[in-house]
Amino acid sequence: MTRRYFGTDGIRGTVGEAPITADFVLKLGWAMGRVLSRRTGRKSRAKVLIGKDTRISGYMFESALEAGLSAAGVDVSLLGPMPTPGIAYLTRTFRADAGIVISASHNPFQDNGIKFFSAEGVKLADAVEEEIEAELDLPLSTVAPDALGKALRIQDAAGRYIEFCKSTVPDRLTLEGLKVVLDCAHGATYHIAPSVLRELGAEVSLIGAEPDGLNINHGVGSTHPAALRAAVIERGADLGVALDGDGDRVVLVDAEGREVDGDDILYLIARDRRARDLLGGGVVGTLMSNFGLAAALEALDIPFERAKVGDRYVMERLAANGWQLGGESSGHIVCGHVQTTGDGIVSALQVLAIMVREGASLAALLQGFEKAPQALVNVRLTPETDKEALLGNEQVQHTVASVEAELGEEGRVLLRPSGTEPLIRVMVEGRPHFDVDALARRIADDIEGHMVR
């Protein structure tokens, strides 16, 4: 079935432009409610949790979803600002039938999106998303007045998730003596992550923790680590932690200001859990994962598999293999022994716990782990440009082939249309003697030259 609305991570776009409009989101809530009621098959009303990040449009879409779900006879519990992984966790612990996230993750405030979790706290199966899309074709109708859904606001949601995050490290472990700069991207973790780290004993200073509805991800967060690098050096911190707007990604910075990405974090957690005989299988990365990660895991005799880009595909491969650990270079890390989805706070805590156990700095822990030089260029497309047609352009394919020939067996090229933004991502990876930045730029320039304007 061809999808009209759902991408790799729910439905996302620019606020006020179809489909990210109040009327569509109201009907989306209604369609979700209809599907849930049918699937649960209970006489009692289905129950859904709704959480959001800090975008100003979140108020509008929260109300729209609440109205649509109520019209379908579904009860709603409102969490307010809450990280995406917190919504997944609370959906499970409240025994809700589904969780809904209002967020566009690392995108700017002008964008927003809707994504769903099942009762188990994992992304919805494709079949369920297709059912929701089918319901959207039907005229909206309201259940009988005595069957309408109710809504309530959960007052202690943040505190519950804070305690969960702390529970993912050993009870007696303390972060006392660690000086941490925390960047919350002016997003959904601003009132949660500082409390988690401080209650575990860390000395925490903040950037990106003053959301105003318009500044989410603006020059801060995991996709803009320069601000964190500068703050770590200026404040003499042991490390920095950068989360994204909805808290499902994390990037770290060591005491010297060097960025520690998702591949580094996966390596550290995998090595630590293997050493303690806790790994439970292998590691799932993605097509974007650095060759150095695969080589380092192989040297440790840890199986490694690549999934398509997107945390839902990482989760699918983890489930298929019966493994627990996976993630993306961007900082989506799934620690399946404690969480059902990517969780930036929890992933950071796993690394902090390793630092405490080993009595070592972040830089020391990564000593000897070498990644292949990798360049990533994002080409933003014009509205008139078709992604697939552009990737199939004969001249673009010729340029890609020439770069691949130049790299030979010592590198690779990956072109990937974003599932959440109007972008084509150009990745070139190669041995140190290649100028991967120049090679990636060559391909990106050719793509830009063939866009429809």
From Swiss-Prot:
Its EC number is 5.4.2.10. Keywords: Isomerase, Magnesium, Metal-binding, Phosphoprotein. Its cofactor is Mg(2+). GO terms for molecular function: magnesium ion binding; phosphoglucosamine mutase activity; phosphomannomutase activity. It is an enzyme of class 5 (isomerase). Binds 1 Mg(2+) ion per subunit. InterPro entries: A-D-PHexomutase_a/b/a-I, A-D-PHexomutase_a/b/a-I/II/III, A-D-PHexomutase_a/b/a-II, A-D-PHexomutase_a/b/a-III, A-D-PHexomutase_C, A-D-PHexomutase_C_sf, A-D-PHexomutase_CS, Alpha-D-phosphohexomutase_SF. CDD domains: GlmM. It catalyses: alpha-D-glucosamine 1-phosphate = D-glucosamine 6-phosphate. Mg(2+) binds at residues 105, 244, 246, 248. Activated by phosphorylation. GO terms for biological process: carbohydrate metabolic process; peptidoglycan biosynthetic process; UDP-N-acetylglucosamine biosynthetic process. NCBIfam families: glmM, PRK10887.1. Catalyzes the conversion of glucosamine-6-phosphate to glucosamine-1-phosphate. Belongs to the phosphohexose mutase family. This is Phosphoglucosamine mutase. The gene is glmM.
